[in-house]
Amino acid sequence: MELIGLRYLNRLLNLVTICMLLLSSCSIDRTEKTVSLKERLYTITDTVPGIVGIAFISDADTVTINNSVRYPMMSVFKLHQALAVAHEINARHSSIDSVIHVSKDELDMETWSPMLKIYKTPCFDISLRDLIKYALTVSDNNASNLLFKRIVSPSATDSLIRLISDDSTFRIVYSEDEMKVKHSLAYTNYSSPLSAASLIRQVFDSTFTIDSTFTTNSTSNSNSAIDSIRKDLTTVATGLDRLGAIKPQHPELFFAHKTGSGYRNDANELSAHNDVGYFRLPDGRAYALAVFIRDFSGTEAEASEIIAGISHEVYDYFVSK
């Protein structure tokens, strides 16, 4: 009996050892894949005349490069702004289709503002839905400035998004209007790549709503606002040569994003060239990717090419898993 018991114990120990080795092998394999992606990305970033920050998030992996650096967000903050406006609409028991009256003295006629090609009169009415759409899809600065002045301020936007973000490594202090006057203020509106990637991933989570996130009363208006924001992010017309450069080869890919483009700093470097996106394959698998470039001593086209190259590498890595 003692001999049988000893044999049984030895077999049990052998099985436990085998299981531990298998689990260890799986862990090593997954780590090697993650490191492999980092190595592939470093081959791109190591030669860039600037600082490149990357964050990739999927259900299985999170990979970051230079994530501890503070990157000027530029118009990426309009994603945060749109979500804060959606919350404020809900808090006021209002609607995204509410209309505000705008007078010419509220507008900057010398800033980037495609909406002024449509709204040419000295005074006009425009819905909050359209202001959000202009701010997101064409990065309209007047639309953003109006939303900050009329609906929710930069500081309130910062506070509200901190309540919902999985990663609060960001700061929003100044509007487009203020940054135009003093370009260096753009460095104060910063984000880590991981924070931006986390936020856009949250937005496209099917369970995400303004109501449950901000613990306010549920209304159809708030859900309508989030749906509108999601739709707008899929029709962003700026920076199509950045993360979305992979889209023509993969038309079946769901893609939504928000770009940000910076001024030249005192060293004549491009202060910011950014894109944060959400990608979903037809099989339902999805990932978020943020690429932020700061202090780049090249052209915007060259910076876009770097972002596009990173997007291609990440896509190839993800679909091969």
Regions found by a protein language model. Name each.
Residues S144-T207, S218:
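Mid-domain, small-residue-enriched loop/turn segments at the edges of structured enzyme/sensor domains
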Residues S27-T43, V48, K149-R150, P154, ...:
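Structured C-terminal helix/loop/strand segments within mature extracytoplasmic catalytic/sensor domains
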